[in-house]
């Protein structure tokens, strides 16, 4: 019973639409009607600006971190990464936003922040290196996911390897429109690097 409650709670935490809430509070807009139409942090940065976008990314990361901590907070015998996966599913398919959410990047990062802080720190550094080199947030996100799989292979944590592999595949799948735009040379590049 407690495991089911924890899974539902993790999903509901992930379902909190940070981008929608911050968009309404900061600018009075629904970010799903602007930019890429996505509820994630990248669209929040593009449509709301750096300050509000930073709040969105922090909120999305926090969702993954909090959900991954639930097994410890609730004293439930379930692997924390499983709770984190349900938060990611909530973020991508949020019940509070008609099941149309983000692309799983920041919330997946939040899962790793709690479970594997060193991986999270190196992942953020790797993301910014890829962003500097490519100027594409989407491509940097996908390449960083691949980095997490390689890293996880060497730390000999089977659960971590399985979860980051599945999350990376999911992140790449969620970016399929971005991949087409990169190939067609229509994907927006970051201008501040």
Curated annotation (Swiss-Prot):
Q: Name one GO molecular function term.
A: acyl-phosphate glycerol-3-phosphate acyltransferase activity
**Subunit structure of this chain's protein:** Probably interacts with PlsX.
Localization of this protein: Cell membrane
Kindly give the HAMAP family that the UniProt entry links to this protein: PlsY
Function text: Catalyzes the transfer of an acyl group from acyl-phosphate (acyl-PO(4)) to glycerol-3-phosphate (G3P) to form lysophosphatidic acid (LPA). This enzyme utilizes acyl-phosphate as fatty acyl donor, but not acyl-CoA or acyl-ACP.
Lineage at the top is:
Bacteria, Bacillati, Bacillota, Bacilli, Bacillales
**Keyword Nucleus included in the entry's annotation:** no
Instruction: Look up the domain of life of the source.
Output: Bacteria
- State what protein this is by name: Glycerol-3-phosphate acyltransferase
Q: Which gene encodes it?
A: plsY
GO biological process terms, semicolon-separated: phospholipid biosynthetic process
Q: Which Gene Ontology cellular component annotation is one that this UniProt entry carries?
A: plasma membrane
The reply to whether Lipoprotein figures as a keyword in the UniProt entry is no
Q: What is its EC number?
A: 2.3.1.275
Relay the activity regulation note. Inhibited by acyl-CoA.
* Major location category of this protein: membrane
Under catalytic activity, the entry for this protein gives: an acyl phosphate + sn-glycerol 3-phosphate = a 1-acyl-sn-glycero-3-phosphate + phosphate
Protein family per UniProt: Belongs to the PlsY family.
State the UniProt keywords alphabetically: Cell membrane, Lipid biosynthesis, Lipid metabolism, Membrane, Phospholipid biosynthesis, Phospholipid metabolism, Transferase, Transmembrane, Transmembrane helix
Q: In which pathway does it act?
A: Lipid metabolism; phospholipid metabolism
Membrane-crossing residue ranges in chain numbering: 2-22, 54-74, 76-96, 111-131, 153-173
* Membrane topology category: Multi-pass membrane protein
Supply the source organism for this entry.
Bacillus subtilis (strain 168)
* Database matches in NCBIfam families: glycerol-3-phosphate 1-O-acyltransferase PlsY (TIGR00023)
